[in-house]
Amino acid sequence: MPVLNLRSDFAEADALPEQMGAIGRRARAAARRMALASARTKDAALKLIAERIRASRDEILSENARDVAAARCAGQTAALIDRLTLDPGRLAAIADAVEKVGSLADPVGRQLAAIERPNGLLIERIAVPLGVVGVIFEARPNVTADAGALCLKAGNAAILRAGSDSHRSAMAIARAMSRGLADAGLPEDAIQLVPTRDRAAVGLMLAGLDGCVDVIVPRGGRGLVERVQAEARVPVFAHLDGINHVYVAAAADLDMARTVLLNSKMRRTSVCGAAETLLVDRACAATHLAPLVQALLDAGCAVRGDAATRAVDPRVTAASEEDWHTEYLDAIIAVRVVDGIEAAIEHIETYGSHHTDAIITENDAEATRFLAEVDSAIVTHNASTQFADGGEFGFGAEIGIATGRMHARGPVGVEQLTTFKYRVHGTGQIRP
């Protein structure tokens, strides 16, 4: 099938670079057609893709069972196997999520700005697709559908490279998506899955496939993201770590602080928006520190703290320098008492990852300062760090979270998968 790239130019290629180059060229050709697709056509395609995923349930679950069995034989962790595993409910949710993307507003063609010049020129800034998006992911087969759907909605073509653990599952989902694209009359090459486990394919994608890849989005662990950021010769939308902080200021309401802290840390400990460090203003430590630490411990969270924190509960263990740098993704948190907002901001600047940081305070001036000075993609006031999510932002879905400064920052949804062009309308003007 086309999604497998089993065409003559691919099947006869002797070398992986030639094979990957063929995928890139087909993606570029598909991207040109996708950029012109109407909103109605794209939405119809998403609905048809969702239907194809549902209709392919037995095939997808069978291939997923093979992936899971192989992962167990390879001794993979329970956490990875859980991320890898699909069941009828999870697969139905994947199909529903694809269909939901179709209900989002079309990001393409929006007028972002209009300028009328004194000489009569009308200049418009218009949203257009990025082009070809390369997505490299590991054990979550749902990324195949999520990333493909978001790229399609934004008028892009996608080249997807699944990890070895999820390869069979991803291929089965991609086959269903290819059928849905064909049903809608859109190019099947708009969503291609790299049909090899060879890791050299990743390097070729990072090199840009001879100019065919416009941006790379990695979805996976630190090792993958580090490699992508180090080797990519095209722009990258990614975050390396989620070392997120909750700062409880002197003017914080204790009940609110406790509720927000517990949600930030314990709602889901393994997500990138989970809090990893609690900072407490020394001015309120006498009233706030012990109750907050007790709440964490009672919720099953291990606490590693500085001397002031260890003094309030014997269950607290000593925090090392490494703890302030650590993204636990587990029921563990580091706690430090700081001398006011300036020290809190300095700590976040030194140890943070520019992902998501929160302040709990009833002092508006203090909140304003924190929101302005903390240099993170997402900064919250009296709200959980776990709102770091495209769905919670009203984006409908996200392809990831970016902490860089160029183009996309924070949740990367369909709007962030577009760029812009200028349209200049004249009546014969020439430049003097």
UniProtKB/Swiss-Prot annotation:
Gene Ontology cellular component annotations, sorted alphabetically: cytoplasm
Molecular function GO terms recorded: glutamate-5-semialdehyde dehydrogenase activity; NADP binding
Pfam families: Aldedh
InterPro entries: Ald_DH/histidinol_DH (IPR016161), Ald_DH_C (IPR016163), Ald_DH_N (IPR016162), Aldehyde_DH_dom (IPR015590), G-glutamylP_reductase_CS (IPR020593), Glu-5-SA_DH (IPR012134), GPR_dom (IPR000965)
Compartments, record wording: Cytoplasm
GO biological process, one term: L-proline biosynthetic process
UniProt keyword terms in alphabetical order: Amino-acid biosynthesis, Cytoplasm, NADP, Oxidoreductase, Proline biosynthesis
EC number annotated for this UniProt entry: 1.2.1.41
Signal peptide: none
Reactions mediated catalytically: L-glutamate 5-semialdehyde + phosphate + NADP(+) = L-glutamyl 5-phosphate + NADPH + H(+)
Pathway assigned in UniProt: Amino-acid biosynthesis; L-proline biosynthesis; L-glutamate 5-semialdehyde from L-glutamate: step 2/2
Keyword Cell inner membrane in annotation: no
Organism superkingdom: Bacteria
Keyword Aminoacyl-tRNA synthetase appears in the UniProt entry: no
Family statement drawn from the similarity comment of this UniProt entry: Belongs to the gamma-glutamyl phosphate reductase family.
Function: Catalyzes the NADPH-dependent reduction of L-glutamate 5-phosphate into L-glutamate 5-semialdehyde and phosphate. The product spontaneously undergoes cyclization to form 1-pyrroline-5-carboxylate.
PANTHER family: DELTA-1-PYRROLINE-5-CARBOXYLATE SYNTHASE, GLUTAMATE SEMIALDEHYDE DEHYDROGENASE
Protein name: Gamma-glutamyl phosphate reductase
